[in-house]
A protein has these predicted regions:
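Membrane-embedded alpha-helical bundles of multi-pass integral membrane proteins
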Residues: 11-15, 21-22, 37-193
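Perimembrane topogenic segments of multi-pass inner/organellar membrane proteins
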Residues: 1-35
Length: 193
């Protein structure tokens, strides 16, 4: 039952919340999609945190999406141990860069008084959720090696089943709890946005 809730109900519920909430926010308050700008309040930490965070996370998310969309090509790519090791090292390095950038952005929001004054509770909730998700990804990369390879055979078929409106949670059942938490956390982030 829990697997059905986690891997068949929560993903659809998260997407529904994101779509309906997005429409509602657009109609009621179009400017609520972003935290208040703090660029003029303190920009040095913003630059280093923002650049590290955005470059790191966009490349990590890009790899997740490429493996999802081009799964056969990705499986072929990571079938060679040298390419697999290279992708794993690059992915871990990028996730560490993203995490450090996000940590800098969170610290800036908490420490710089003028920035803290324009920080809403929802800003902090989202930043903590993002940091948790990236930390889980790093934990998986360090503790459950070769994720670039097994992702294609577990999470990708599960995500494809969701898109086809025929959820197959059995693909996720045998994965470690931390991987399951990372997968569900991704959909919770979708709902938060």
């Amino acid at each position: 039952m829990w697997n059905t809730i986690l891997f068949a109900v929560i993903p659809y519920l998260a997407v529904a919340i994101a779509v309906l909430g997005g429409i509602w926010r657009y109609r009621t308050d179009r400017f609520s999609y972003s935290s208040q700008s703090s660029q003029f309040l303190e920009s040095r930490a913003l630059f280093w945190g923002s650049v590290s965070w955005h470059y790191g996370i966009l490349m990590i998310l890009g790899a997740h999406v490429v493996a999802l969309v081009l799964w056969n090509q990705w499986a072929s790519l990571v079938s060679n141990p040298t390419r697999l090791y290279t992708l794993e090292v690059i992915g871990l390095a990028l996730s560490l860069v993203a995490f450090l950038g996000l940590a800098l952005l969170i610290a800036r929001r908490l420490i710089v008084r003028r920035v803290a004054a324009v920080t809403t509770p929802m800003d902090l909730v989202l930043l903590i959720a993002l940091a948790t998700q990236v930390a889980l990804g790093i934990w998986i990369a360090l503790g459950y090696r070769w994720g670039s390879e097994w992702y294609v055979h577990t999470a990708v078929p599960w995500l494809h089943s969701l898109v086809k409106l025929n959820p197959k949670p059995e693909y996720m059942v045998s994965l470690p709890a931390i991987v399951k938490l990372h997968a569900v956390g991704g959909f919770l982030l979708i709902a938060l946005f």
